[in-house]
Amino acid sequence: DHRDLHSFPTRRSSDLEFAILQLFMQNPGRALSREDILTSVWGRDYDGELKIVDVNIRRLRIKIEDNTANPTYITTVWGYGYKWGL
């Protein structure tokens, strides 16, 4: 099942959520650490908490996953980060 950005339901996404999704699409199958995501999306100068990545991943999953309890697109790599699951 191959999907791209255009096949997802059209639900309003924030620029940050779109940037995260784009990062995953540019790195298919590669596990990205929370730090990788934070640096790529928020920039090196961001001085906030790493938890902001988890919060935005959760919001993105609500919009694209059929079952957020068992995600198929954005999967968790425990103790590391996240991976685009397709």
Task: Give the location of each predicted region.
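Short, small-residue-biased leader/transition segments that mark boundaries at the very start
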Residues: 1-13
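Conserved active-site beta-strand element of glycosyltransferases/polysaccharide synthases
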Residues: 82-85
